[in-house]
């Protein structure tokens, strides 16, 4: 579950990055094609439509614009030939001629299958790429569990996006409190407590059945909301019969006036704010845990590019935490004199310093073999180091402190590691790491 969650967050980050790049691209005339095909669409339909468009575009008066549009349609047709059918999650294709920052024209073609089904159909020729439909991929589809429990029965449900589902409900007949009974009053009270206890136990057992995935033994929901009109919900949340794995997932305990489906709807309304901030809460928890390791000086943490990469190479990092807008590039540089390959990680200021592109001892020039954002490199390579990758924002107080105070990169370690012992191995170059 955690791995799936982490993978999904990385896919979302990649889409965000792609949208950012596509939104800023501009072209001359209407030579930029945005094409989105939902699942179960037909490639043949789109191919025919593009052929018709090609015929229409041949009549464009302006020669330059006509050539650009025809070229973009041809690119789209060529790319579609690679697909026999639309992939299960749909297909997104952007192609056209864009104008670069230095005024040159450049052909771009991007096609991919989204990480989850896209429910949009789009074909537009314009002077920009249309990315609005991609925003639905960024919407959270986290699933939340709801347990609505009162004196008449319990309802188990889930909410994902705007879709609510009732998994199961059952009713109970609990004896009411009463003052009669004479000598039997204590016995009645005991029977009543026993029935209440059995009711809580049954609810706890069913909760485990519905909200724990038997294959992974992990919760299949991102959070749990307990709701009800009496104190049953509180009793359940504090009961030792309630699975501790689910106890850790409780986001909120709310009072509702009804039981059953009406109570379910009311619980959703009352929890709306908490559910919308769940990513925010997870981020605060993660960075809070990181700060706790630092304040207790456990040695199970690492920060800064250089130390984090050393710990990664050793396989010591369990969770790699990176600010989603970290502006550092990874350079693969070749020393032309010795043929040696050097890896450097440089921020914007360091890129302007030419000494970073020369050998410190011989002053030989280092030729750039490859340059890519460090974030992208992490997204592609993190699994190789056996860690999970978590992107964080600087919107929460903790996130902002992490970005300002720790350079926006760090990790929680599997075991204690004193990074100072590796300092003498370093050559003192900031953001540098050699293969």
Curated annotation (Swiss-Prot):
Sorted alphabetically, the keyword list is: Acetylation, Cytoplasm, Growth regulation, Protein biosynthesis
SMART domains hit by this protein:
eRF1_1
Q: What is its main location?
A: cytoplasm
Protein's cellular compartments: Cytoplasm
Where in this protein does the record say N-acetylalanine is found?
2
Family annotation (InterPro entries): eFR1_2_sf (IPR042226), eRF1_1_Pelota (IPR005140), eRF1_1_sf (IPR024049), eRF1_2 (IPR005141), eRF1_3 (IPR005142), Peptide_chain-rel_eRF1/aRF1 (IPR004403), Ribosomal_eL30-like_sf (IPR029064)
Record-level GO cellular component terms: cytosol
GO MF terms listed in the record are: translation release factor activity
One biological process GO term for this chain? Answer: translational termination
| Subunit organization | Heterodimer of two subunits, one of which binds GTP.
Its annotated function is as follows:
Directs the termination of nascent peptide synthesis (translation) in response to the termination codons UAA, UAG and UGA. Modulates plant growth and development.
Q: Which PANTHER family match?
A: PEPTIDE CHAIN RELEASE FACTOR SUBUNIT 1
* Similarity field: Belongs to the eukaryotic release factor 1 family.
| Official protein name in the record | Eukaryotic peptide chain release factor subunit 1-3
């Amino acid at each position: 579950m955690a791995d799936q969650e982490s993978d999904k967050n990385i896919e979302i980050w990649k889409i965000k990055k792609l949208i950012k790049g596509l939104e800023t691209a501009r072209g001359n005339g209407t030579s930029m094609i945005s094409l989105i095909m939902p699942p179960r669409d037909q490639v043949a339909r789109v191919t025919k439509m593009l052929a018709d468009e090609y015929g229409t575009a041949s009549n464009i008066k302006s020669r330059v614009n006509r050539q650009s549009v025809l070229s973009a349609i041809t690119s789209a047709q060529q790319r579609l030939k690679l697909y026999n059918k639309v992939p299960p999650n749909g297909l997104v294709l952007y192609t056209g001629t864009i104008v670069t920052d230095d005024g040159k024209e450049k052909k771009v073609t991007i096609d991919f299958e989204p990480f989850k089904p896209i429910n949009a159909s789009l074909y537009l020729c314009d002077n920009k790429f249309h990315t609005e439909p991609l925003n639905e991929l960024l919407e959270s589809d986290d699933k939340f569990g709801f347990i609505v429990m009162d004196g008449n029965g319990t309802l188990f449900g889930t909410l994902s996006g705007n879709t609510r589902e009732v998994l199961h409900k059952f009713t109970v007949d609990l004896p009411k409190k009463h003052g009669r009974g004479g000598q039997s009053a204590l016995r009645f009270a005991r029977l009543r407590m026993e029935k209440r206890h059995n009711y809580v136990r049954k609810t706890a057992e069913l909760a485990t059945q519905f909200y724990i995935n038997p294959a992974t033994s992990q919760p299949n929901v991102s959070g749990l909301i307990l709701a009800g009109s009496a104190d049953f919900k509180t009793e359940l949340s504090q009961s030792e019969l309630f699975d501790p794995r689910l106890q850790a997932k409780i986001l909120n305990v709310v009072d509702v006036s009804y039981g059953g489906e009406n109570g379910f709807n009311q619980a959703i309304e009352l929890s709306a704010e908490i559910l919308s901030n769940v990513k925010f809460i997870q981020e605060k928890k993660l960075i809070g845990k990181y700060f706790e390791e630092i304040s207790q000086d456990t040695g199970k943490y690492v920060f800064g590019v250089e130390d984090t990469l050393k710990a990664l190479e050793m396989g010591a990092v369990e969770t790699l935490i990176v600010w989603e807008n970290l502006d550092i590039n990874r350079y693969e540089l070749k020393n032309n004199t010795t043929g040696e390959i050097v890896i450097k990680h440089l921020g914007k200021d360091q890129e302007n310093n030419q000494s970073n592109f020369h050998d410190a001892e011989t002053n030989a020039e280092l030729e750039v073999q490859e340059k890519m954002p460090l974030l992208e490199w992490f997204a592609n390579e993190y699994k190789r180091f056996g860690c999970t990758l978590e992107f964080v924002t600087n919107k929460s107080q903790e996130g902002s402190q992490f970005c300002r105070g720790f350079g926006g990169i760090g990790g929680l370690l599997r075991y204690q590691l004193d990074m100072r012992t590796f300092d003498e191995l370093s050559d003192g170059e900031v953001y540098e790491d050699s293969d």
